[in-house]
A protein has these predicted regions:
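Active-site activation/catalytic loop segments of kinase-like enzymes and analogous catalytic loops
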Residues: 357-390, 403-424, 434-439
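Active-site catalytic-loop/activation-segment of kinase and kinase-like phosphoryl-transfer enzymes
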Residues: 116-136, 140, 266-317, 444-448
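Conserved Nudix-box catalytic region and its N-terminal flanking loop in Nudix hydrolases
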Residues: 2, 11-53, 61
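Juxta-kinase regulatory segment immediately upstream of eukaryotic protein kinase catalytic domains
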Residues: 101-159
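Active-site acidic catalytic loop and adjacent metal/ATP-binding pocket
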Residues: 19, 160-176, 181-182, 210, ...
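A short coil-to-beta-strand element that immediately follows conserved catalytic motifs
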Residues: 52-62, 154-160
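ATP-binding pocket architecture of kinase catalytic cores
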Residues: 24-27, 60-101, 160-270
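A cross-family kinase active-site recognition segment
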Residues: 235-302, 323-325, 353-354, 426-432, ...
Length: 451
């Protein structure tokens, strides 16, 4: 994918920014990811073409506003360049302009906003994550080097940005063995490092090994597992892989369910408690006029009423089956589980909570879309894995309700995520809640059509 990059590079002295001879922002087109991994191509260009080592604070790719195949307008903000750096020919530092000039319209509002901050030397807003603030990259890189060395895994090269978005950031660095990743998470996911370490200690076959954590910063270092994601295996093999993934998560959940002490440890470490009993009120708020679960401003009252009533009925039927509360993943999809040797390894426990494990099925089949063989294999394996802990036939009878409560849970999750993002970056998490609302309503429509 072609990225149409527009740069905001502050000068080493305050009140200046890198500009072209025409007074506009520097711009170039490069090949790269159109989403949160755009930072890889951006950092490589700055490093290799300009010799600029200033950390990238933000990439702002607006992929939804352009047609398929068109270059993605992407605004880039860096830390100030060092005084010893020499700009490329045709570029020079000049006073911060009042406007960004002729930039593509999708990135114009963000360019105006960031230029105003630079002109006024104002601090970033409260909701801007730490990795989009000056000094974070050097601090995180220094800790990554020290912590990795202390763990017996010294780095053999510099950490480089791998992923950058409002809810998380990743740095990647080489070692004599597999690469290491430093993951940083935003405040609602602040407990992920400690939770992941606790789960990895209890379930080393299913959760990646944690090399180090920094709880106050919300950092963890994990090893690159270097294997194929379940969602990337050949389509003919995917039903079996999805079945294995379902069994792996349920096995972990069944082991945790009777262990009150282990669940209490997770809660004490910061895992939220999200009982199904709270789901009806939470989803009503998430799709209401002040909600962020399905875009801004909610949905029509009559439509919302139908959804809330359906969620209430589904909660009652699912709770009657008696699935025990346990740790839930919260974002269990086929891009968060890998086949490593002969086992399934589940990553990205950002959304982990203590709740009813019914909520994890809907995401596990979401990426299969209309591939019914995959959906059936994953669903059957999930149901079979819970049989014995509960009445398997009773659980199978409420599969629709399981999917409804899972979809509602996701809408509430997206509401919490989006309201904790800086407004200008909420677009990066728009659409997820809408997808699960459609999933929920499709079940209701199918049932009504069958009557």
């Amino acid at each position: 994918m072609k990225l149409d990059l527009w740069f905001l590079v502050p000068g080493p002295s305050g009140g200046t920014i890198l500009l072209g001879a025409d007074g506009g922002l520097p711009t170039v087109q490069v090949e790269g990811s159109e989403t949160e991994a755009a930072v890889i191509a951006v950092a490589a260009y700055l490093r290799d073409a300009w010799g600029l080592a200033a950390p990238v604070l933000e990439t702002h790719p607006k992929w939804k506003e352009v047609g398929e195949g068109e270059p993605i307008p992407t605004l880039v903000l860096t830390e100030p360049a060092r005084a010893a750096w020499t700009p490329p020919p045709g570029l020079a530092f000049a006073p911060v302009p009042a406007t960004p000039g002729e930039v593509p319209w999708p990135i114009r509002p963000r360019a105006d906003e960031l230029l105003a901050e630079l002109r006024g030397n104002t601090p970033p807003p409260e909701l801007r994550p730490r990795w989009m603030r000056r000094g974070w990259f050097d601090r995180a890189s220094t800790w990554m080097r020290t912590a990795s060395s202390d763990a017996g895994r010294p780095l053999t090269g510099d950490p480089r940005p791998f992923f950058l978005r409002g809810i998380s950031a990743l740095l990647r660095a080489p070692t004599d063995g597999p690469d290491l990743f430093l993951k940083a998470v935003f405040p609602p996911f602040h407990a992920e490092p400690v939770l992941t370490r606790l789960l990895a200690e209890r379930f080393p076959e299913t959760v990646p090994t944690v090399v180090a954590v920094e709880p106050d910063e919300g950092w963890l270092i994990v090893e690159d597992i270097g294997s194929a994601w379940v969602g990337d295996v050949p389509e003919a093999d995917r039903p079996a892989a999805l079945a294995r993934g379902a069994r792996a998560l349920v096995g972990l959940q069944r082991a945790m369910a009777p262990d009150d002490g282990a669940r209490r440890t997770l809660l004490d470490a910061g895992a939220p408690h999200r009982p199904l009993a709270d789901l009806v009120a939470s989803v009503a708020a998430a799709i209401g006029p002040d909600g962020f679960g399905v875009g801004d401003g909610g949905i029509q009252p009559e439509r919302a009423r139908r959804v809330v009533e359906a969620v209430g009925a589904a909660v009652a039927r699912v709770e009657a089956v008696g699935l025990p509360e346990s740790v839930v993943h919260g974002d269990f999809h086929s891009g968060n589980a890998a086949i490593v040797d002969d086992r399934i390894v589940i990553i990205d426990w950002s959304d982990a909570a203590i709740s009813n494990p019914a909520i994890d099925l809907v995401t596990w089949i979401a990426w299969s879309r209309d591939r019914q063989a995959e959906i059936d294999a994953a669903t059957d394996a999930w149901l079979d894995a819970w049989s014995g802990a509960v009445d398997g036939e009773a659980l199978r009878a409420v599969v629709d309700e399981v999917l409804i409560v899972g979809a509602a849970y996701q809408i509430v999750s997206y509401d919490g995520i989006r309201r904790n993002l800086e407004p200008a970056t909420r677009y990066t998490m728009t659409g997820g809640g809408d997808h699960f609302l459609k999933t929920l309503e499709a079940i209701l429509d199918r049932r009504e059509a069958a009557v």
